[in-house]
């Protein structure tokens, strides 16, 4: 089975590639803006059995050439993924999350391919609510990132309903892995605890009272594998385990036997321009669509412990 992972150098691209690599009947191609940088990154994480293809997702001629190879599955993971940064990079966020996706859908329609297309969406597409979220919940994003993801969500759905393409939306809640960029909250928390342990360093944070479902990326990718064999639809992939930033912070510092209050400070420069205080999923309703027997194994303190051990072992600070 031929798989194309668009934007394959991020945590989802790397994680899904590693899983598919273990299966004998999958051939994986990854698109990237920089062959040399991505090759070095994949080598670092022990990912060898993939082919790299240079691609500008805004260039439809390049996409046409690539898709003429007739892939069985296409995973669209490209895109600027920071809600906070999206306020500063509005055009880049829109181009990468929406226009690139639009180009792929239009070329798939033009070639009349039977390919299954998976668009990575986000919990940021929903409105601010205390209710548990399912795929039909009200959608009203508050950031350019969320708006760009909602545009691609709606377009992916449109191409499925009107043009009968085999298109899927994968609505992903917060995800963590060894490959996650260190600027995000959970890696920052883990690294702050390590720095406090090693050198008594104090780290500045924004608001830590936000509540999220932090997932382990590999578990979400295993759910994606389940979705691959479902009828084209829209799915929420999250574990239903909610924790505040403070809870995750306490897990990290307690693990290293430290009092976090001595090593963190609140700094307004880290506040997001706009943010949701709470994001939680209607886990049982969502998971029944994918695999009713599935249960998460890695969440909460387990995520924190895994990351700290990995960072310490690989001397990442």
Describe the predicted segments one by one:
Residues 116, 122, 154-178, 187-190, ...:
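Conserved beta-loop-beta element that borders a ligand/cofactor-binding pocket
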Residues 18, 30-32, 193-317:
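C-terminal substrate-binding subdomain of Rossmann-fold SDR/epimerase-dehydratase oxidoreductases
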Residues 45-59:
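Rossmann-fold cofactor-recognition segment
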Residues 3-23:
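N-terminal Rossmann NAD(P)H-binding glycine-rich loop of SDR-like oxidoreductase domains
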Residues 55-95:
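NAD(P)H-binding glycine-rich loop region in Rossmannoid oxidoreductase-like domains
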Residues 76, 102-142:
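Conserved Rossmann-fold NAD(P)-dependent oxidoreductase catalytic core, especially the SDR/UDP-sugar
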Residues 83-84, 119-133, 144-150, 175-179:
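Conserved catalytic-site region of short-chain dehydrogenase/reductase
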């Amino acid at each position: 089975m031929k798989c194309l992972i668009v934007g394959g150098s991020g945590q989802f691209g790397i994680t899904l590639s590693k899983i598919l690599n273990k299966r004998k009947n999958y051939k994986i191609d990854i698109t990237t803006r920089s062959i040399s940088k991505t090759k070095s990154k994949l080598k670092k994480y022990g990912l060898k059995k993939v082919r790299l293809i240079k691609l500008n997702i805004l260039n439809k001629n390049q996409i046409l050439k690539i898709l003429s190879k007739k892939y069985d599955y296409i995973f669209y993971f490209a895109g600027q993924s920071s809600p906070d940064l999206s306020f500063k990079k509005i055009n880049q966020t829109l181009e990468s999350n929406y226009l690139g996706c639009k180009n792929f859908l239009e070329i798939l329609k033009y070639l009349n391919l039977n390919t299954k297309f998976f668009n990575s969406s986000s919990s940021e597409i929903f409105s601010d609510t205390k209710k548990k979220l399912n795929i039909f919940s009200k959608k009203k994003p508050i950031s350019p990132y969320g708006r760009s993801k909602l545009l691609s969500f709606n377009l992916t759905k449109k191409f499925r309903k009107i043009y009968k393409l085999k298109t899927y939306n994968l609505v992903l809640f917060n995800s963590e892995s060894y490959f996650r960029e260190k600027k995000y909250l959970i890696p920052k928390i883990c690294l702050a605890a390590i720095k406090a342990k090693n050198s008594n360093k104090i780290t500045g944070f924004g608001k830590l009272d936000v509540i999220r479902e932090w997932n382990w990326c590999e578990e979400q990718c295993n759910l994606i594998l389940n979705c691959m064999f479902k009828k084209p639809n829209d799915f929420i992939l999250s574990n239903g385990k909610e924790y505040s930033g403070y809870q995750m912070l306490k897990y990290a510092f307690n693990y290293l036997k430290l009092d976090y209050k001595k090593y963190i400070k609140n700094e307004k420069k880290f506040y997001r321009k706009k943010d949701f205080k709470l994001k939680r999923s209607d886990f049982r309703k969502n998971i029944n669509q994918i695999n009713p027997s599935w249960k998460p194994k890695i969440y909460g303190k387990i995520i924190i412990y895994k990351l700290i051990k990995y960072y310490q072992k690989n001397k990442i600070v």
